[in-house]
Amino acid sequence: MANHDPISDMLTRIRNASEKRHQTTRVPASRMSRSIAKVLQQEGFISEISEEGEGVRTHLVLELKYSGKHRHPTIRSMQRVSKPGLRIYKNTRALPKVLGGLGMAIISTSKGVMSDRDARKQGVGGEVLCYVY
């Protein structure tokens, strides 16, 4: 079955694994999924990223983070914003603050994929891929 939106697929896999308290989850590897995973790691939502497989069948293995004695997921929610049928672009001043700054937005800019905080610091806007909190 063809996957028409690999970013939504990645977010859904991470969300489902996080809800079920899995230690790791596998995501098909691409430049975009690597970039999103790297941003999630830099912001503290994922502890480790590794790759397995070769060529077309390469997967990213993401080690999820949990907090506290009862292992509460660090990722509470992931929401896709810009979709293949309706792209959402924002300039620097219009970049959203997710939950008043407690969450983050992942933005695809001309300087690469980055968090909303980094995009504001660098003064660039772009496509709002998703919200994470």
From Swiss-Prot:
Superkingdom to which the source organism belongs: Bacteria
A GO biological process held by the record: translation
One cellular component term from this protein's GO annotations in UniProt: ribosome
Residue stretches in coiled coil: none
Keywords assigned: Ribonucleoprotein, Ribosomal protein, RNA-binding, rRNA-binding
MF terms (GO), sorted A to Z: rRNA binding; structural constituent of ribosome
Family annotation (PROSITE patterns): RIBOSOMAL_S8 (PS00053)
Keyword Cytoplasm: no
Family per similarity comment: Belongs to the universal ribosomal protein uS8 family.
Protein purpose: One of the primary rRNA binding proteins, it binds directly to 16S rRNA central domain where it helps coordinate assembly of the platform of the 30S subunit.
Assembly, per entry: Part of the 30S ribosomal subunit. Contacts proteins S5 and S12.
PANTHER family: 40S RIBOSOMAL PROTEIN S15A (PTHR11758)
Protein name: Small ribosomal subunit protein uS8
Organism: Prochlorococcus marinus (strain MIT 9313)
